């Protein structure tokens, strides 16, 4: 995997949506990992901003993330609105901003699903689309 960049965006629905829209249109970007903004405060705008961009929701991501998080933070996991989806051939993962949540998401879900060696299935073939066609 190659990191193409890091972008910090204010918790504003339209700024978040604009930045992610630009990234999913970029043929070099295959995956986006967003952290923060998935809770229940007035500033947690990531779901509202990003969900409308998805062609396909990956419902199982949020479900599995909360199941794994339950092992670590018990019932507090219900406050997470972690989610993922495919948009223009780019997979977008949105996870809570805490270091523990980011580690859980990467180590126990995302890294495996972005590896072509993970069986029986992974997201790699979903990402190998020509965005220019």
Residue locations for each model-derived region?
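Non-catalytic beta/alpha edge segments that cap or flank active sites
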Residues: 1-133
């Amino acid at each position: 995997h190659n990191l193409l960049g890091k972008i910090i965006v204010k918790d504003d629905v339209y700024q978040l949506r604009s930045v992610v829209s630009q990234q999913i249109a970029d043929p070099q970007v295959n995956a986006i990992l967003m952290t923060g903004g998935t809770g229940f405060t007035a500033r947690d705008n990531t779901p509202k901003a990003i969900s409308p961009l998805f062609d396909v929701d990956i419902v199982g991501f949020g479900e599995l993330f909360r199941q794994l998080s339950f092992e670590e933070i018990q019932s507090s996991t219900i406050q997470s609105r972690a989610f993922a989806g495919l948009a223009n051939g780019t997979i977008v993962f949105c996870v809570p901003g805490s270091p523990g949540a980011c580690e859980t998401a990467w180590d126990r879900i995302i890294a495996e699903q972005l590896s072509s060696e993970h069986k029986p299935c992974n997201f790699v073939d979903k990402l190998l689309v020509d965005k220019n066609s």
